[in-house]
Swiss-Prot record:
Secretion signal, residue range per the UniProt entry: 1-20
Protein name as annotated: T-cell receptor alpha chain V region PHDS58
GO BP annotation list: adaptive immune response
Source organism of this protein record: Mus musculus (Mouse)
Pfam family, one: V-set
Keyword Signal included in the entry's annotation: yes
GO cellular component: T cell receptor complex
Glycan attachment positions: 90
InterPro entries: Ig-like_dom, Ig-like_dom_sf, Ig-like_fold, Ig_sub, Ig_V-set, TCR_variable_region
């Protein structure tokens, strides 16, 4: 009987874990001049140690991973000059780039997950570089 309950209990904990996590990206759209710096805000809610991610979706393409954080140095270096900083006290994982190029125009998604939970994505921030 107990063996039959284990899969059900496992599903319960995964679903409970997924319900407890959320991601907020307060800026739906950001317009920035080429060569200027960029910061995209991400706040998360998660009761345990989070895995944090930033993804980018360029026009007519799928999601691509920019960077991820689990532990260690709170400043994470990503691809193409992007970096993000983890702040446990502020529950934030803001993405930054010192100087943007027109090719950085895309939609950026922050995401959180736990050890045994699915990714929970923010609503995305559309970046337009002029």
């Amino acid at each position: 009987m107990l063996l039959a309950l284990l899969p059900v209990l496992g599903i319960h904990f995964v679903l409970r874990d997924a319900q407890a996590q959320s991601v907020t990206q307060p800026d739906a759209r950001v317009t920035v001049s080429e060569g200027a710096s960029l910061q995209l805000r991400c706040k998360y809610s998660y009761s345990a140690t989070p895995y944090l991610f930033w993804y980018v979706q360029y026009p007519r393409q799928g999601l691509q991973l920019l960077l991820k954080y689990y532990s260690g140095d709170p400043v994470v270096q990503g691809v193409n000059g992007f970096e993000a900083e983890f702040s446990k006290s502020n529950s934030s994982f803001h993405l930054r780039k010192a100087s943007v190029h027109w090719s950085d125009s895309a939609v950026y998604f922050c995401a959180v997950s736990g050890f045994a939970s699915a990714l929970t994505f923010g609503s995305g921030t559309k970046v337009i570089v002029l």
